[in-house]
Regions:
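C-terminal regulatory/interaction regions
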Residues: 2, 260-334
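Metallo-beta-lactamase
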Residues: 2-5, 72-84, 111-164, 215-218
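Conserved beta-strand hairpin/beta-sheet module of binuclear metal-dependent hydrolase folds
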Residues: 7-66, 70, 176-186
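Core dinuclear metal-dependent hydrolase active-site scaffold
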Residues: 39, 150-178, 183
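Active-site metal-binding loops of divalent metal-dependent hydrolases
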Residues: 50-52, 81, 106-107, 169-170, ...
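Metal-dependent catalytic neighborhoods of phosphoester/phosphodiester hydrolases
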Residues: 86-96
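Divalent-metal (often Zn2+) His-rich catalytic cores of metallo-beta-lactamase-fold enzymes
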Residues: 215-269
Length: 334
């Protein structure tokens, strides 16, 4: 049942990628080109990333279009629990009754009880929360399997997804390697790739962004030697080494620009303005026919406001840690 898909006439939001893998546009907030989910249609079918609550019916319809019944899905994996990646987990669990839900151990409790996550999101997004993400519903705890530094998902016939803890963007983030293809599912660890322009921007939101952890994760991803990078934002890319190098270069440029602003006494607004002037201005202009909604959502998720806020938060935390270390050293010398 897993090698008989007629790929002719597939809907625009479903893209065959070979090796029984299909990218599915989750249509976040109704807009295309924002979040990619992936169906691995093997003996034990698996979906990587679920998008928001509003994305669950989109994924159900795609799975059925690709010749599977909802009962066939064996596993649902989320790279991390941010709402654009995992907000629909509870809805997906209801639609796919036999699927095990796999998440990093630091995020597992929030899938079972998303009340704290939703309260935090409400503080960040305000009135935009419902429009962008909808409500995250609880997932039955017995169906959740958490993984730590590494873990495995059985895809059948000896093929597996191997998880690797990949913090920096979030403390509950992991990457996933398909042992049958060498594909690496990167979540937000490399940032946001804009298919409209080819630009790659970092994703550095508060409160978890950590530059040092990001760089370690990029090093881990280099060492994996992947054949292809599967972005959650957005799509598959086979220029692996070049793309990881670009991700690091962009990350360093954003952080250095914000640091320069902060070191000269600039506040958040000043840092955002500097990033727009010195960094964002380098990116290619959007095509004239680009969806205004897609552009707005991408800018909301990984634009200067969110990214600079996360970088400033990390720099402030770093300064506090350095000051505390200095104070303790002086006390020891006294």
């Amino acid at each position: 049942m897993h090698d008989d898909v007629d790929v002719s006439g597939l809907p625009e939001g479903i893209t065959p990628l070979g090796n029984q893998i299909y990218a599915i546009d989750t249509m976040l907030a109704g807009y295309p080109g924002v979040v990619s989910a992936y169906l691995i249609r093997t003996e034990r079918p698996c979906i990587v990333e679920v998008g928001t609550a509003g994305s669950a019916p989109v994924l159900r319809d795609a799975v059925i279009r690709l010749g599977l019944a909802p009962e066939d899905l064996a596993t649902i994996v989320v790279t991390h629990i941010h709402l654009d990646h995992a907000g629909g987990t509870g809805d997906m669990a209801a639609l796919f009754p036999n699927a095990e839900i796999v998440v990093h151990e630091r995020g597992a409790r929030h899938l079972a009880d998303p009340s704290r996550l939703m309260a935090s999101a409400k503080m960040v997004w305000g009135d935009r929360l419902e429009t962008l993400f909808g409500q995250m519903h609880p997932t039955e705890a017995a169906r959740i399997r958490s993984v730590a530094e590494t873990g495995e998902v059985d895809l059948g016939a000896g093929r597996k997804l191997v998880s690797h803890y990949a913090p920096g963007h979030a403390k509950h983030h992991m990457g996933l390697v398909d042992t049958g293809t060498g594909d690496l599912y990167v979540g937000d660890a490399l940032g946001v790739y804009n298919p409209l322009t080819g630009d790659l921007r970092p994703a550095t939101p508060p409160p978890d962004f950590d530059m040092d952890a990001c760089l370690r994760t990029l090093g881990l991803f280099r060492d994996i030697g992947a054949q292809r990078l599967m972005f959650s934002h957005f799509g598959a890319h086979d220029t692996v080494t070049e793309t990881i190098d670009r991700a690091e270069d962009e990350l360093r440029l954003w952080v250095e620009t914000v640091r320069d602003s902060r070191d000269t006494g600039g506040d958040l607004d000043h840092a955002i303005a500097m990033v727009r002037d010195k960094v964002v201005s380098r990116y290619k202009p959007l095509p004239a026919d680009a969806s205004a909604g897609t552009v707005a959502v991408l800018d909301t998720l990984s634009g200067p406001e969110a990214n600079v806020s996360g970088i400033m938060h990390w720099l402030d935390k770093l300064a506090q840690e350095q000051a505390e270390a200095k104070r303790k050293a002086e006390e020891e010398r006294a």
